[in-house]
Every structure is written in C-alpha cells, then in structure tokens.
C-alpha cells in the first residue's frame, strides 16, 4: 500500500502531467525562453503551480521552494522539478518527466 504523502504527491504529479500533455499536443501554447544555456518554458511554471497547489491543499504548513514568497520554517520541504527534460519537451521529443520529492529535516522521505 502506498503511503498517504506519496499518494498525494502522485495525484499532484498526475494533475501536472495532464497539463503537460495538453500543452505537448498544442505547441502553440508553449512559450520558450533560454538563458545561460538553459531552456525554460511557461509550462514549467504552470505545472509547478499546479503541483504546489495540490500539495499545499493537503499540507499548507510545509515548505515549497519557488512557491513560497517568504521562506517558512517547517521540517517538511517539497522538492519539485515540474518538467525534467525541458529541452526535449520544447523540441517535441517525448522524453521528459515530473520529479517530486519530500524531505524531513533534510533527509529524503518520499
């Protein structure tokens, strides 16, 4: 049986994946920018917001880097890469993923 926090993270990832799939099928919705040899898209931010919103609904006291305007103090911190493989996504190469992890007092727990 999957643990509750992992189950909630999986649901958040699925919600983000739906948005990625929608945008992947509609390249006209993707805005691409680059800096320092890195590629960024609007989809990265949109998916991050979807995932953080889903997780924050269940865990409002947890810390979400890039999602918290002011750094809160909590033992739980979520690490989110909303679109791992952005270059592939931007080039319409279907090799990309969502990565979500949770740490407790600096140690990976999920």
Per-region residue spans from a language model:
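DPxDG-like acidic metal-binding loop motif
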Residues: 74-110
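N-terminal subdomain of lithium-sensitive/metallo-dependent phosphomonoesterases centered on the IMPase/IPPase/PAP
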Residues: 1-83
């Amino acid at each position: 049986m999957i643990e509750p926090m992992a189950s909630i993270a999986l649901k958040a990832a699925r919600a983000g994946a739906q948005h990625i799939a929608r945008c992947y099928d509609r390249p006209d919705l993707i805005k691409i920018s680059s800096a320092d040899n890195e590629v960024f898209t609007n989809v990265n931010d949109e998916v991050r917001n979807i995932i953080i919103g889903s997780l924050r609904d269940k865990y409002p006291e947890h810390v979400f880097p890039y999602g918290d305007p002011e750094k809160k103090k909590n033992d739980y911190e979520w690490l989110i890469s909303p679109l791992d493989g952005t270059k592939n996504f931007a080039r319409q190469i279907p090799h990309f993923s969502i990565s979500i992890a949770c740490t407790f007092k600096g140690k990976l727990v999920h």
